[in-house]
Amino acid sequence: MHIDNAITTTIETKTWRKSDTTWTLGLFGTAIGAGVLFFPIRAGFGGLIPILIMLVLAYPIAFLCHRALARLCLSGSNCSGNITETVEEHFGKTGGVVITFLYFFAICPLLWIYGVTITNTFMTFWENQLQLAPLNRGVVALALLLLMAVVIYFGKDLMVKVMSFLVFPFIACLVLISLSLIPYWNASVIEQVDLSQISLLGHDGILVTVWLGISIMVFSFNFSPIVSSFVVSKREEYEPEFGREYTEKKCSQIISRASILMVAVVMFFAFSCLFTLSPQNMAEAKAQNIPVLSYLANHFSSMAGSRSTFSITLEYAASLIALVAIFKSFFGHYLGTLEGLNGLVIKFGYKGDKTKISSGKLNLISMFFIMGSTWLVAYINPNILDLIEAMGAPIIASLLCLLPMYAIHKLPSLARFRGRPENYFVTIVGLLTIFNIVYKLL
């Protein structure tokens, strides 16, 4: 596959600024959240061969899809215009409404997913690590959501600071856990590879496993919510001095490096989990509807014979890190969901007039809807991977893959990017992810 020269000799002779490093880490940190804790389950579900194929696809999916979205954001005439303003400029007010809906429905299902996840993670920690009697699911979900609602309502600024602070400790913990699992690696996943029994088609075939894995990669390797802000920042910094073409290449360079970091950390974590567990263990984790760290904690707690202090520490650390990761991701996506829902309420409930309702009342109304719907989904307890594949990933793909490809096909300002092989790749990734909805209904 051809990936055009985003990193050119000219760009390499320019100074790499501190702000470029900051944004590289910012994009990287945005993507590394609770979604990563489910990727090893889907990736390892089919054994070694599908995850090796996903390893090959991971960087192109992460880099090319986000670069396409960045190019759309760069196509607006206003350096300070965000993606909504850019889409409105190109496609009118209807386009602005569509992008507002897409943003809201791309983020809100993620909150539902995290609501289910944090409830299940807390309950399995309570029952397996603390060895306490089972609790009522509805009460647990309500208590956890009320706790987060109180933190959000009374300490938004503190929440943002804590959330930002937790990004890199969480990444460090993922790397440390991946390294810590090495002594527990085994060859079972390799021994189970039987080339004579490999099936390409069918429900458990390699093609279907990789297809569903692409959806989880789109979900897990996703920093699209921050791409618009990133592009605006880089345009304001570079475009007046070096021009738009250079700014586009600089954005591509930063996205490329962030994608490399992200793929390296997530794939190492996935392989470490797979070599510690087995495809059968991954199937159990999916059936139990818990993230892989919670399953690892339960796995270590059920080990026969005498256990080392290290394995006991890892058992508790895995559960606590999972809880922190989900809290972090929930808070981050809550802010985006609140902003999107507030925009929809003002646009359709008050005809765009912000003066007709106070911000406090608007936030309270939106909070009741968000928390109420999240509690209901958490209580019902749908399978998280199925929810990701049927709702979260397809909506993200429509925004991350298909919208930029449509813009490149239609807009004169993006005409120079037409006809490139990577466009077909991004389009296929988007369509495959969306077609998961049809597959889930069959």
From Swiss-Prot:
Location in the cell: Cell inner membrane
InterPro entries reported for this sequence: AA_transpt_TM (IPR013057), Amino_acid_transport_2 (IPR018227), Hydroxy_aa_transpt (IPR004694), Thr/Ser_transpt_TdcC (IPR023726)
Transmembrane segments: 21-41, 44-64, 96-116, 139-159, 162-182, 206-226, 258-278, 312-332, 364-384, 388-408, 422-442
Cellular component aspect of the GO annotation: plasma membrane
Listed GO MF terms: L-serine transmembrane transporter activity; symporter activity; threonine efflux transmembrane transporter activity
Main location: membrane
Topology within the bilayer: Multi-pass membrane protein
Keyword match Hydrolase: no
Pfam name, any one: Aa_trans
Catalyzed reaction equations: L-threonine(in) + H(+)(in) = L-threonine(out) + H(+)(out); L-serine(in) + H(+)(in) = L-serine(out) + H(+)(out)
Keywords for the protein's UniProt record, in alphabetical order: Amino-acid transport, Cell inner membrane, Cell membrane, Membrane, Symport, Transmembrane, Transmembrane helix, Transport
Function: Involved in the import of threonine and serine into the cell, with the concomitant import of a proton (symport system).
Similarity-based family: Belongs to the amino acid/polyamine transporter 2 family. SdaC/TdcC subfamily.
HAMAP family from the UniProt entry: Thr_Ser_transp_TdcC (MF_01583)
Protein name: Threonine/serine transporter TdcC
Organism of this sequence: Yersinia enterocolitica serotype O:8 / biotype 1B (strain NCTC 13174 / 8081)
Organism ancestry: Bacteria, Pseudomonadati, Pseudomonadota, Gammaproteobacteria, Enterobacterales
